[in-house]
Amino acid sequence: MHKFRQKYIGDKAFYKRYLMLAIPMIIQNAITNLVSFLDNIMVGQLGTEQMSGVAIVNQLIFVYNLAVFGAVSAASIFGAQYFGKGNHKGHMYSFRFKLYAALLVTAIAMTLFITNGTGLISLYLTDTAGNGATEVALAYGKEYLEIVMIGLIPFAVTQAYATNIKETGQTFVPMVASFAAVGSNAVLDFLLIFGIGPIPKLGVAGAAIATVMSRYIETIIVVLWAHKNRDRNRYLEGAYRGIGMPFDEFKTIFIKGLPLMLNELFWAAGMTTVTQCYSVRGLSVIAGLNIATTITNLFNIVFIQLGACISIVVGQYLGAGELEKAKDADNKMIVFSVFCCSVMAAVMLLVGGFFPQIYNTTDEIKSLATSFIAVSAIIMPFCAFTHSSYFTLRSGGKTLVTFLFDSVFTWVIVVPVAFVLAKYTALGIVAVYFLVQATELIKVVIGYFMVKSDVWLVQMV
């Protein structure tokens, strides 16, 4: 027992450092997801078709978001280690790489949405009821997409700045910026969706406008603070004096980071493909999944952000050449993440059924959403472990391994299982959803052996 405690349980100083880093990130994402939840409810009050149209577009935006995260994360592997080593010029080059990569992804996404937005939305619409509801949902989805695209550029810029700021251990400012953004989003949503006084009722368009405005507010706060506090953000020294970076630097980040960039993109595309597989069971399934996903995201933030902290803390130890400290911290953080998420899963099981009742939709959709939430709660602790394993491998620059662990697993195991069960079996959609989610158990075994092998204990800078 003593050996177990020594290996997997830290002292007060360890948890204080970990939580000081994690709590602002958890709060930031909690507020963001809470406002997304409120936004979802407000759109849901307009009707099932409006809610479904917006939900489908948000699936497409989800792929874009993850592609941007992948682009900036590729350089973040080096950024955390550069900062740990005190190499501010290297940190500056990683920032440039992030900015260029995020804007390139944005340009590609906007081109796709403009030229083929209707086709992409239609992939998720199957009119099993024969009442024409899918055409209405398509119209609302197109309206929402055309406006929300305007907010993609500030989102890309924010990610480049915020990730670099976090790599220096300053998680408070991105949190404040996020508070301002989501707070304004909530207020603007209420005003523009329903219309108050002289402000007209804009419905779905109002939700999109509110999202775009909040994106710009967040960007302005993050960028202005970073440039006004250059002594704390030394990577900005000379960041805009030129546009290039040493070829060797670019090559190193690109080669190491490409699997990570592709991983985020393919994983997100895989998850949306799984949703598309479910959608053949009808619009009610999409609506139920939308409600369940919104609720689940509120609870998932704990393991997502605890995992992200692993990459920062372990990355800094690796950059400083303290490999044993990196391994020790990683063991303790993984156990802590799984424990916290087991508690969150229990809470989610107890209260998850109350949330769908808030929505203005059918009893069938509410029942589906409740069942989906329960399944997600059961699987959550396993997701916490695999997520922590992923960030452990990533902190040591094992991007090809993470690509195999995440994206290849999704496309080789998860997508085929979802496709076959949804399209070629008579199983109920809840049973299908459970079996697809249960594939995470295979990933747990793979993640355990990968982390245990210490293949990730590498100093790259």
PLM segments and residue spans:
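Short alpha-helical transmembrane segments in multi-pass integral membrane proteins
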Residues: M1-A22, G79-G151, I199-L258, V314-I379, ...
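Transmembrane helical elements of multi-pass membrane transporters/channels
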Residues: M20-D39, I147, A181, S214-E218, ...
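Transmembrane alpha-helix boundary and packing residues in multipass membrane permease domains
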Residues: M25, N29, I41, N58, ...
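Generic alpha-helical transmembrane segments of integral inner-membrane proteins
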Residues: I26, A30, L34, L38, ...
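Helix-terminus/linker motif at the lipid-water interface of multi-pass membrane proteins
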Residues: A30, L34-S52, I121-E135, L191-L202, ...
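Small-residue hotspots at the loop-to-helix junctions and early N-terminal turns
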Residues: T48-Q59, G141, L145, A208, ...
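Small-residue-rich hydrophobic transmembrane alpha-helices
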Residues: M51-I114, F155-P174, I286-G352, C383-F405
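Short runs within selected transmembrane alpha-helices of multi-pass transporters and secretion channels
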Residues: V72, S76, I147-K166, P174-N185, ...
